[in-house]
């Protein structure tokens, strides 16, 4: 029975990932005053299926000097971790309702760094290695602010369980009292998922394609799916943290519809940002984090710690 539950979670995610690639190409197309994919099927709807077939029937070549086991293991690990992070997400009911769901998600996103590092190192190519080192530095750096922002939000929620956030936000969305945190969180999620304007790992003019430059066919598709699964997951996480949907146990469908609309709008904003902004320079990317975001988030975290103590407010006990 549990296996069926897992499949019921994984299959829709993979379908969503497939069609997000199409949506991205269509949105970017319309923003550049062109049509996007419109040949394969009506409105290009069969394009993701064609892409999947093409990628998975190609021969998975690898460099002669690469480390075979690690080279193959890295993309599998990337997708595995990307799918694992969906387990504690309340939509409205999670697959496993963990007491420390937020901590679990932080741990899994930190582990994802290894798949990037291994792929760059095992490729035995200077471009892949530089891309991997950039990606790792960027991911680790932005995880610092993500963790501090999460801590501040959880101080308002009073529990590490994600389902508690739904109860916390019945009266008011947390984006209203904590809008500076929400803005920094959104920008940090962009950097964490390696999206424009923070896609330094894929700087075409410098690194060809970043850490996955030596990958082709199936393994490349796994990296691609992991990236897009992470994008959707991060937007869902943002919707849960800051745009909490009121959950009526008698009509759980309303929660799901509400929640899906918010997540889709956030995903659309990712695509909009990609179409609008040029890429950052690497030093600007690090400057933004260590000299702007980190002091601000630390100050706000101290504020959220001291406020309940000053006003004798006791957070909800669970």
Swiss-Prot record:
Core subunit of the mitochondrial membrane respiratory chain NADH dehydrogenase (Complex I) which catalyzes electron transfer from NADH through the respiratory chain, using ubiquinone as an electron acceptor. Essential for the catalytic activity of complex I. Essential for the assembly of complex I. Pfam families: NADHdh. InterPro entries: NADH_UbQ_OxRdtase_su1/FPO, NADH_UbQ_OxRdtase_su1_CS. This is NADH-ubiquinone oxidoreductase chain 1. It is found in: Mitochondrion inner membrane. Keywords: Electron transport, Formylation, Membrane, Mitochondrion, Mitochondrion inner membrane, NAD, Respiratory chain, Translocase, Transmembrane, Transmembrane helix, Transport, Ubiquinone. One of its GO terms (biological process) is mitochondrial respiratory chain complex I assembly. It comes from Bos taurus. It catalyses: a ubiquinone + NADH + 5 H(+)(in) = a ubiquinol + NAD(+) + 4 H(+)(out). The modification N-formylmethionine is found at residue 1. The gene is MT-ND1. Core subunit of respiratory chain NADH dehydrogenase (Complex I) which is composed of 45 different subunits.
